[in-house]
Regions:
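Active-site microenvironment for binding and transforming phosphate-containing groups
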Residues: 1-274
């Protein structure tokens, strides 16, 4: 029996041999394109595995989404806190290290890739601005989600109470296991949260004599955005762990060096008026 990852926040789409997830909330906006790709159809956006396969994957997903692959903008991601504004689909980002893109232009589709890190999609339906953010644990510590939101507020006049933030499939606290050094980084940066919420769970049994901890990065990102003024009801989580579902979703933790990359795409389409 084929598995279906649909839940109250996500819909699992199967079309022309390709499978992807979409946020139900974002489907309420007819000019908005959104998706998180799955493995099915041999989709893999990791250029190091195969540049040709990555390009084929873009062609495939654009075909089922009815999106022009020539208006895809994809940055060179390096776990930074750098967020750039995009004004043209032909904009050359070069080899600059960028982990977040924002735009208020139509017919520009922002594509970022993931293999356990949290995809954060931002949408301001009032000012028609979007963002696509790559927030791994390093990006979370650097508060890239908050920085991208602040940049949308500055560039487009977005108000936090109007912004919708969607967290795509990512490694859950159930599998995001770290040692003392990384745990301390989170405690030092987010002490105000860790004292109040169960963001860090200490494992009861040592592994090879080493104390391990499990961290909830999604909760940190949520609390950071709520603190900025986003409404809790407008922060929507997929509820899907990439490691738990590594048969359908690329995962670095599960697949190790053979890992592939999933893609998150967000864009606003220019629809013809009838």
């Amino acid at each position: 029996m084929e598995r279906d990852l649909s839940n109250e926040n996500m819909i699992h789409v199967k079309k022309d041999g390709i499978e992807y997830l979409q946020f139900r909330k974002l489907l309420e906006f007819e000019d908005l394109v959104n998706c998180f790709t799955l493995k099915t159809g041999n989709l893999n956006f990791r250029r190091k595995t195969s540049e040709e396969l990555a390009l084929q994957s873009i062609q495939k997903i654009c075909s089922v989404l009815d999106v022009n692959p020539n208006i895809i903008v994809r940055p060179n991601q390096k776990h930074t806190d750098c967020v750039e504004k995009v004004d043209s689909a032909s904009e050359d980002l070069g080899m600059r290290e960028i982990d977040g893109l924002i735009t208020n232009k139509k017919d520009i589709n922002l594509l970022l890739t993931f293999a356990d890190c949290t995809p954060i999609i931002l949408y301001d339906p009032v000012n028609k601005a979007i963002g696509n953010i790559h927030s791994g644990w390093r990006g979370t510590v650097q508060k890239i989600g908050k920085k991208a939101t602040l940049k949308m507020m500055k560039e487009y006049g977005s108000k936090p109470e109007n912004i919708i933030a969607c967290f795509g499939p990512a490694i859950g606290q159930c599998h995001f296991e770290v040692e003392e050094e990384v745990k301390n980084i989170f405690e030092n940066e987010f002490g105000k949260f860790t004292k109040k919420y169960e963001i860090i769970k200490k494992q009861s049994i040592l592994k090879d004599g080493v104390q391990k901890y499990n961290i909830n990065t999604n909760l940190i990102n949520r609390l950071e955005l709520e603190e900025l003024g986003l409404l809790p009801k407008n922060i929507i989580e997929s509820g899907i762990c990439t490691v738990c579902n590594s048969d359908l979703i690329h995962s670095y933790r599960a697949n190790k060096e053979s890992f592939g990359l999933n893609a998150t795409i967000i864009g606003q389409q220019e629809r013809e008026k009838i």
